[in-house]
A protein has these predicted regions:
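Low-complexity intrinsically disordered segments
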Residues: 58-130
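Calponin-homology-like cytoskeleton-binding modules
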Residues: 2-57
Length: 130
């Protein structure tokens, strides 16, 4: 099941910090990522539509993956961030990273999700400027 796009939180700095600070549910973080990747839930057929999803994602994940619970999915997300966008978490949010003692798979996945969302936002802005 999916939250309607109109009810997803906006991709603002506040939302991104909520993700980093573990103030948004994993399900909401996943659904933000799914929406940005192009996955759409059809409540009438109760199926996921992936016609807007890039082929490299659709091939591996015909249905949206659980990014917060799946290492392979989050690794693919990490690898899909263009090199020019790898530091957006630091550059745009001033995120200093975690100390070694604070590192957990959950926090790392949330930081990856935020960096990918920042990359998505930057890519959309670049496409709109052309």
């Amino acid at each position: 099941m999916s939250i309607p796009a109109s009810q997803l939180p906006p991709l603002t700095e506040a939302t991104l910090w909520q993700i980093l600070n573990d103030e948004l549910e994993d399900a909401t973080v996943n659904q933000l990522l799914w929406h940005c990747l192009g996955y759409r839930y059809d409540p009438h057929t109760q199926t996921w539509q992936s016609d807007r999803v890039p082929p490299e994602w659709r091939q591996d994940y015909p249905e949206p993956p659980d990014f917060m619970g799946s290492r392979p999915a989050i690794v693919k997300l990490t690898r899909s961030i263009p090199p020019a966008h790898k530091q957006l978490l630091k550059e745009q949010l001033g995120f200093p990273g975690y100390e070694i003692k604070e590192l957990t798979p959950r926090r790392t996945r949330r930081a990856t999700a935020v960096n990918w969302l920042l990359s998505y936002r930057a890519t959309q802005a670049e496409a709109g400027a052309k």
